[in-house]
């Protein structure tokens, strides 16, 4: 096992990288939400895909994906990009007609 830090959390991973098959996907997301996610990925020096995989894998196990420090950084990014949506808004968003 290798011990390293991810999002200010100590993480143990297998000594060798886990080989996976990734596919390209085209998902539509709320514009400001995507801006915050991209900025966070840049801040953490990772790809957007890696960030999303981490968030989803944590959620599948009922674990919080972010440390308190990262949550503070997210709040700043939300303010910068005007993202006021919350978890209560999920599954209620309707796409604006062009």
Spans of features found by a protein language model:
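Residue-level detector of alpha-helical secondary structure
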Residues: 6-7, 38, 75-78
């Amino acid at each position: 096992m290798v011990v390293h830090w991810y999002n200010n959390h100590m993480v143990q991973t297998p000594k060798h990288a886990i080989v996976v098959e990734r596919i390209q996907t085209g998902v539509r997301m709320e514009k400001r939400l995507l801006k915050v996610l991209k900025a966070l990925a840049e801040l953490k020096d990772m790809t957007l895909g890696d960030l999303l995989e981490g968030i989803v894998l944590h959620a599948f196990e009922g674990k919080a994906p972010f440390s308190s420090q990262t949550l503070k950084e997210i709040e700043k990014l939300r303010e910068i990009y005007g993202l006021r949506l919350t978890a209560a808004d999920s599954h209620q968003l309707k796409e604006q007609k062009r």
